[in-house]
Amino acid sequence: MGDGQAAWAAGPCAAEQARSLLAVAWSCRVTADGGREEFVGAHTVADDGRVLLRVPEDSALAAAAVPAPRGEPSAVLEFADVAPVPVRSRIRARLWMAGWFLPADEHLVFRPTRVVLRRPSGAVVVDLDEFAAAHPDPLAGVEAGLLTHLADAHPDAVERLTRLVEPESLHAATRVQPLAVDRHGLTLRIERTRAQGDVRLTFHAPADDVAELTERVHVLLARAAAAACPRTLQRQRADGDR
């Protein structure tokens, strides 16, 4: 869901977003042979996007390590992208990968034949060649710490950034939180009493590391300081609008 400036504008492509999600996801849900198992901290990702999964010897997934007849997928992997900052609807995206497992040393190697990414704007089928060639966003591994620090230590800066948001997007807003950041920009979650929306603040140039990100955010804050101050965020009663 987005309002105000176009959400996800000048952002990562679907393949890069899928690889970023895969790189930082901590848990993996696997559906195979009619069963479903959840694995936590058990997967790594190869450079070409294959998933290496460590499973117990008695796992039912051992049976899924043989390709299905006619090359049909034998398993579906699901990953969730959870916002590190407490907000409503914390699932920012989901990634589904259909394919099959092959045994290799101490791992099962999952080779995807179909990759689907569901974002707030809808679901998209990711091209397999683009998925294999893509790299995670350079800030993906530090995003959680950056966002929680911004929300906890610099709420004044977050509110100042709302000066860059169209006034109609802030109507009846009760809280604004940093939702996501990548090398292209920062996304704010604008919460209202009964709804929420996301607004994208695009950087003037990509940020490939934390130092560059700091500079990009300072530029946004400078722009915000020069902008007209928006109407103060309304503090609604917990029991609803008046």
Question: Where is each model-derived feature located?
Answer:
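Binding-site signature for planar aromatic cofactors or substrates
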Residues: 1-242
